[in-house]
Amino acid sequence: MAAAAAAPASSEKEVLPPSLTSSSEPPPLFDGTTRLYVAYHCPYAQRAWIARNYKGLQDKIKIVAIDLADRPAWYKEKVYPENKVPSLEHNNQVKGESLDLVKYIDTNFEGPALLPDDSEKQQFAEELLAYTDAFNKASYSSIVAKGDVCDEAVAALDKIEAALSKFNDGPFFLGQFSLVDIAYVPFIERFQIFFSGIKNYDITKGRPNLQKFIEEVNKIHAYTETKQDPQFLLEHTKKRLGIA
């Protein structure tokens, strides 16, 4: 069975709160409100944010944005001792780790399923989720390295291209949109920007499946609502990675 269609998108763009800083007061913690703590430019937080949007939980899960450059002390002391984003405050508990949160949101809240019933697709999903860190490492390493795009990054992108051809019932990793796409798209979004802006390299050239994936995922409102300005992401990352 294919994953269900996304919850109907509101015609109005969600008004997002400003990021909280070291001088900001905390929200009324553990008052029964479910809160997703994010940083707007963080790809890991973006995963959980997309899942929340896709399942139509904008009224059930409140976004709380944290300024990672000027974090409020109460976030580590009272919310999430790991002091990272994303985290989810739900049922008087706080949970973290982005892929775990995507699965948790899918399991514990109503809305369209993020994983199909098909056992072959479920197995492939786990293989792809296990590969995310290696894909990200290969890509970021190449961005930082001097010279042309390294062989490891090319191989990683080619692996994604091949993975996107496994199921022919749609343009996404499992055919239809799923948690696997949610795991990868924040990073594919960034690598397209970074490889172009830093290495003058088009990640979609010679990769028609990846090109189609990017085109189709940008038609999904739950994702596009979470996108940040490409130039900001490029400059922010160049500064963070020490790239002139």
UniProtKB/Swiss-Prot annotation:
It comes from the Eukaryota. Glutathione binds at residues 85, 97-98. Coiled coil: none annotated. It holds the Pfam family GST_N_3. Residues 32-113 form the GST N-terminal domain. Induction: Up-regulated in the leaf sheaths of rice plants grown from seeds that were inoculated with the nonpathogenic P.fluorescens strain KH-1. SUPFAM superfamilies: GST C-terminal domain-like, Thioredoxin-like. Residues 118-241 form the GST C-terminal domain. Residues 1-27 are annotated as: Disordered. One of its GO terms (molecular function) is glutathione transferase activity. Belongs to the GST superfamily. HSP26 family. This is Protein IN2-1 homolog B.
